[in-house]
UniProtKB/Swiss-Prot annotation:
NCBIfam families: asp_carb_tr, PRK00856.1
Function (record text): Catalyzes the condensation of carbamoyl phosphate and aspartate to form carbamoyl aspartate and inorganic phosphate, the committed step in the de novo pyrimidine nucleotide biosynthesis pathway.
Reactions catalysed according to its record: carbamoyl phosphate + L-aspartate = N-carbamoyl-L-aspartate + phosphate + H(+)
Residues that coordinate or bind L-aspartate: K161, R243, R305
Enzyme class: transferase
Protein name: Aspartate carbamoyltransferase 2, chloroplastic
Localization (cell): Plastid, Chloroplast
Record lineage: Eukaryota, Viridiplantae, Streptophyta, Embryophyta, Tracheophyta
Record entry for activity regulation: Feedback inhibited by UMP.
Ligand binding (carbamoyl phosphate): R131, T132, R182, H210, Q213, L345, P346
Amino acid sequence: MTASSSLFSCSMHMEVLTPKISKWPKNFVSCHSKISYVETNYLKSTCYPISRFFCINNLKKTRQRDGIHCFSEGQKFQLDDVVEAQQFDRDILNAIFEVARDMEKIERNSPESQILKGYLMATLFYEPSTRTRLSFESAMRRLGGEVLTTENAREFSSAAKGETLEDTIRTVEGYSDLIVLRHFESGAARRAATIAGIPIVNAGDGPGQHPSQALLDVYTIEREIGKLDGIKVGLVGDLANGRTVRSLTYLLAKYKDVKIYFVSPEVVKMKDDIKDYLTSKGVDWEESSDLVEVASECDVVYQTRIQKERFGERLDLYEKARGKFIVNQNILNAMQRHAVIMHPLPRLDEITVDVDADPRAAYFRQAKYGLYIRMALLKLLLVGW
């Protein structure tokens, strides 16, 4: 028996319903006796076309009436989009990390390397990127999928003619199965996810968030330090404009007995909303201007660049902030032997090149871990667990 619609291609073999498009209006919960929907805080604010819900709801009712279970337990990924770090809980994080470890073991030309064959990912980048764009494209291709890419959508797409983000998303979703979006405006990914009928992955939205970077950062810490509970992390550099440190802070707050140090020039201090969030979650945090002392206490020194592009015409403030906190041999000498230095990259002069040779310099390994995290995300969003 086979059921189909404009949204789904449903096969009753093995009692599994395989969505052609994996984005659903509500999270799916499967059990042995019934299938039900649950709303999440993130999804409650999202509006979906009634026709999509009607189709899905009727499929659900049909399958329940026939006594057939459409999803094997745990097959459907809990999230429809990856927009912000607050979407993840510890169970989801642990499960994603398990999938990422599996991704590390995939061999070329193996059956596992073709699990996304027939799927097409669009990378829509309105801001420059090297690692994020290339790692997502590499992740897709390493799993057998294909890629549509635009490197500078702000200049070389219809956005230059005045097309809205919403119209662009509605158009591009007709060509692809998933969109990886980087945009210069905070909240752009949420806007895209609200109107898209396919998964949206936030690859950075202005000074807002960068959730896939935070996932790979936490994965890196686990791989390098061996634990996440009880760690001390020093966040250094541009904490006001750095979307990576915002997303990372949200994820670190999910672990026990974590302490976070904020080390930054006055003009780019961590914003109050993040500090208030940590306080509300009972996370210990401290602001400091002594990088040597913080480095001596921390398991992770997470350095970031001062983001010149966020200063506009106030280049005097940029020059005032730049170069104030540098990771060099003096910082290495203060650090513990097990500790690591991380950086989301690109690096300017905030980590001296001679640090690269020290085994505690983890930033290039961090970039490699990002490939496996993004392979895991693509696999989960498109085909499930």
